[in-house]
C-alpha cells in the first residue's frame, strides 16, 4: 500500500535525500518460544488482577492508590510515578478497561465507552492512537507516550522497559492521509538524532495496523562524462 507523503510544493526537499518506507513485521513477542517467564508478559491478562483507579474529572488524571495494584501494573509495563503518585495514561486506561482489567471510579464508574467519549472531546486523534497502542500491546510490547511529534510512541521489547532506552519510535498515520514530505523528513531526522529507529504505523480503513520502517538513502547527481 503506497503512502502519499509528497506534495508539489515539497518534492524538492527530497531531491538529494529520500526517506523510504519498507514494510516491516513486528514480531509477536508473546509467541517467543525462548521466553518461559509468563509473569513478565505484558499481555498476559490471565495473571493480571482487576485493578482499581480513581479519575480526577477536571484534568482526567488516573491515579492508582493501592500498593498491590501498583506493583502488578508496573510489572506489566503500565503506569508511571509522578510526584509520588502512580499514574495511568489515557491509552493504558482504555486498554485495561477494554480487557476488563480495571475498574475506574470518579463521580461514577466509567467503562471503556464512557471514558472514550470523554477523551474524544479532548483529543480527536485518541482513537487512532488507541488502535496503534492496542495492536502493539497485543504483540507483547510495552508502549509509552512519545516525544510530542503527534501520534507517536516509544516502543520497548519485552523486559527492556525501565532497563534500556526504547529502540523504536512509532508514528501513526491514517490510510489516505497526505502529509508534507518536508515535515515527515524533519520528524524522522529528529528521531534519528535521538539514536532511535522510526517505525511508521499506518492504520488501514478496516482498522488493521501495518508497520513500515524508514531507511534513509542519499542520491548523488549522475553526470555524464564529456
Predicted feature residues:
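Long Lys/Arg-rich low-complexity intrinsically disordered regions in nucleic-acid-associated proteins
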Residues: 1-226
